[in-house]
Amino acid sequence: MVIGVLALQGAFIEHQKSLAACGVDSIQVRKPHQLEDIQGLIIPGGESTTMGKLMNQFELFEPIVEKAHNGLPLFGTCAGMIMLAKDIAGSTQPRLGLMDIEVERNAFGRQVESFETELTISELGEAPVRAVFIRAPYIKSVAANVKVLAKYNEKIVLAQQDHYLVAAFHPELTNDVRLHQHFLKMIK
């Protein structure tokens, strides 16, 4: 199994380290042809408007959407979650628009208000998950076909719809690989 990690900006190397800790190979994806031999794709954090511009410049939107419609599992973290959302509150920025969610950008404040906390995610076991929130979005609303996996202060921060998984936080910035393992189980 080989997982692609979109490598235009953000913590893509940290995602690759998490995948390696799970015993899985990964490649950095910057061009459409690199999507051909992967079994899943992680879209990392970063700045979502910049990411959208870069994805457009590198002609990645259509190939990712096509692969996703054909069943390619996607995992979006922070800005990656924004890119997967069908709706972004108050924004018309470019996005993949694959997941039936509406997100609010920078919902937990500015960079200086970034924080870490522990989340209970029953799908990942009893031990809490350390979650790093950096200028994080949250999910304002979900369609009936979206499963909410975790909330923080009553705000949805982790959700799954079919072969799409999104997190408002950065699991790759901790040593806990359970969320990456959950994504990998979606592929097998």
Curated annotation (Swiss-Prot):
A Gene Ontology cellular component where this protein is annotated is: cytosol
Reaction catalyzed:
aldehydo-D-ribose 5-phosphate + D-glyceraldehyde 3-phosphate + L-glutamine = pyridoxal 5'-phosphate + L-glutamate + phosphate + 3 H2O + H(+); L-glutamine + H2O = L-glutamate + NH4(+)
Q: What is its EC number?
A: 4.3.3.6, 3.5.1.2
Q: Which NCBIfam families match?
A: PLP_synth_Pdx2 (TIGR03800)
Gene Ontology biological-process annotations: glutamine catabolic process; pyridoxal phosphate biosynthetic process; pyridoxine metabolic process
- For whether the record's keyword set contains Lyase, the answer is yes
Q: What pathway does the UniProt record associate with this protein?
A: Cofactor biosynthesis; pyridoxal 5'-phosphate biosynthesis
- What is known about its subunit structure? In the presence of PdxS, forms a dodecamer of heterodimers. Only shows activity in the heterodimer.
Query: From what organism does this protein derive?
Result: Desulforamulus reducens (strain ATCC BAA-1160 / DSM 100696 / MI-1)
Protein name, as recorded: Pyridoxal 5'-phosphate synthase subunit PdxT
Catalytic residue positions: C78 (nucleophile), H170 (charge relay system), E172 (charge relay system)
GO function term, MF aspect, one? glutaminase activity
What is the role of this chain? Catalyzes the hydrolysis of glutamine to glutamate and ammonia as part of the biosynthesis of pyridoxal 5'-phosphate. The resulting ammonia molecule is channeled to the active site of PdxS.
